[in-house]
UniProtKB/Swiss-Prot annotation:
Belongs to the UPF0056 (MarC) family. It comes from Escherichia coli (strain SMS-3-5 / SECEC). The keyword Cell membrane applies. InterPro entries: Multi_antbiot-R_MarC (IPR002771). It is a multi-pass membrane protein. Keywords: Cell inner membrane, Cell membrane, Membrane, Transmembrane, Transmembrane helix. Pfam families: MarC. This is UPF0056 inner membrane protein MarC. One of its GO terms (cellular component) is plasma membrane. Its main location: membrane. The gene is marC. Residues 1-7, 66-68, 140-154, 218-221 are periplasmic. Residues 29-44, 90-118, 176-196 are cytoplasmic. The chain crosses the membrane at residues 8-28, 45-65, 69-89, 119-139, 155-175, 197-217. It is found in: Cell inner membrane.
């Protein structure tokens, strides 16, 4: 049981900086200004469900995609590391706010015409929470843990769905409490936390690249 908690804790530490619910909160507040409370709650729940579904598909179908296209684990690690590091640099040195992204602008125009338009999948679930970096990390981690003997087989079966469920619950709670979070932390606090998470992502991305290169060297040495 202790191994299960360790696996869940490790998974949350890896995924939460990438998912970054606080950035999604700021985006949600910018897009849901004209929605009533019931509609906001519905969008929050749907976004969380979509995030859980995306992560589950990425984890269980990722290996099939790799096998189909002949992608090696070192190659995936290097590619995933580049994506994660790039996202980290963008969070560390932001050039635009989440609300100014093309997806958010498109939804803003749609909301002007139809205030009850669905913002749960795009942009809240994807790309804000379960974007390319999150998906690449999940696929790469799935390939790594299946070859690892660190955890028992039953832990590797139970932990991933629980991790994805907890990330979805954290996102749901953050969106439901978005107003309170913004009042408590403020825009400056969210930016500071996002930059800290960005630094962590750069470190994680670089380490992914190093691990991929080392595996290639071992293979051909």
């Amino acid at each position: 049981m202790l191994d299960l908690f360790k696996a869940i804790g490790l998974g949350l530490v890896v995924l939460l900086p990438l998912a970054n619910p606080l950035t999604t909160v700021a985006l949600f507040l910018g897009l849901a200004g004209n929605m009533n409370s019931a509609e906001r709650n519905r969008q929050s729940l749907m976004a969380s469900v979509y995030v859980f579904a995306i992560m589950m598909v990425a984890y269980y179908a990722g290996q099939l995609v790799m096998d189909t296209f002949g992608i090696s684990i070192p190659g995936l690690r290097i590619a995933g590391g580049l994506i994660v590091a790039f996202i980290g640099f963008r969070m560390l040195f932001p050039q635009q706010k989440a609300i100014d992204s093309p997806e958010a602008k498109s939804k803003s125009k749609e909301l002007e015409d139809e205030p009850s338009a669905n913002i749960a999948f795009v942009p809240l679930a994807m790309p804000s929470t379960a974007g390319p970096g999150t998906i690449a990390m999940i696929i790469s981690s799935a390939s790594t843990v299946r070859q690892s003997s660190t955890f028992a087989d039953w832990v590797l079966m139970v932990a991933p769905p629980l991790i994805f469920f907890l990330v979805a619950v954290i996102l749901w709670g953050s969106l439901r409490s978005s107003g309170a979070i913004m009042r408590l932390v403020g825009k400056g606090g969210i930016e500071a936390i996002s930059r800290l998470m960005g630094f962590l992502l750069v470190c994680m991305g670089v380490q992914f690249i190093i691990n991929g290169i080392l595996e290639i060297i071992k293979t051909y040495h």
